[in-house]
Amino acid sequence: MTESFFPEFTARPFDADDYLPTFEVPTWLGPPWHQQPGVVHETRELGRSDSTVVLLDGFRCFDEGFLLRIIVRINDRGRQARHRTFAYLERAHGRGYLDERFAPNGLRWGIQYSTSQKATTQDESPYPPDGDLESAVVQGPVIGGNGRPEVHMDSWTRDFWVWPVPPEGLLRIAVEWNERGINETVTTLDAGPIRAAALRSRPLWPES
């Protein structure tokens, strides 16, 4: 028998190193593991032009922040034209935390709390250059991508993590995309349902 391409190995016991402790990340960085969010079914049109519609598609709310879903729908007929638009969104739909290849006329959006605190996709990343998340001091609010975007037919979809939970009052969401003909458009929502949904969030497994 000829020598095997692969070396011999001894199977490692699964109980030796397969235990995965709860992966805790700073609250500004993303949603917590093993927590069931409270959901707000809120759909709004955030911006529109002849070629493009930007939509808000609900909130999933945790005790420290919330995920919101942004959907971009385009009516470009050509496959290559759609590909160019979605490829741009894939690599750059903001600065810093959301990539540094942002085009000045590209999609940008942001949120503002009733306290006048504001975060936009043009903000620099709060991620510390030295990677020391434990000692990083971050001032909210913060917007960050969560997971990979999804593309299907005429739509691009992505979830975004927003930290912290907004205070009582109004939540403003602004969108602008000059290249696609969307002027700056501001949508105002009541933060109350988001706050109530955050209180409904629960751990999936109570601590033993």
Predicted regions and their residues:
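Internal, hydrophobic beta-strand segments that form the core of beta-sheet-rich folds
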Residues: P167-R180
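Acidic, serine/threonine- and proline-rich intrinsically disordered appendage/tail regions
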Residues: I194-S208
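Short acidic/polar inter-strand loop motif in beta-rich domains
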Residues: R77-G78, K118, W177-V186
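A short secondary-structure junction signal
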Residues: A81-H83, Q122-E124, N183-T187
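Residue-level recognition of well-ordered beta-strand positions that form the cores
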Residues: R69-R73, G110-Q112, W161, A174-E176
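Main structured recognition or catalytic cores within long modular proteins involved
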Residues: I173, D190-A191
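N-terminal onset of structured domains
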Residues: T2-P104
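Extended, solvent-exposed segments with strong compositional bias
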Residues: A103-W163
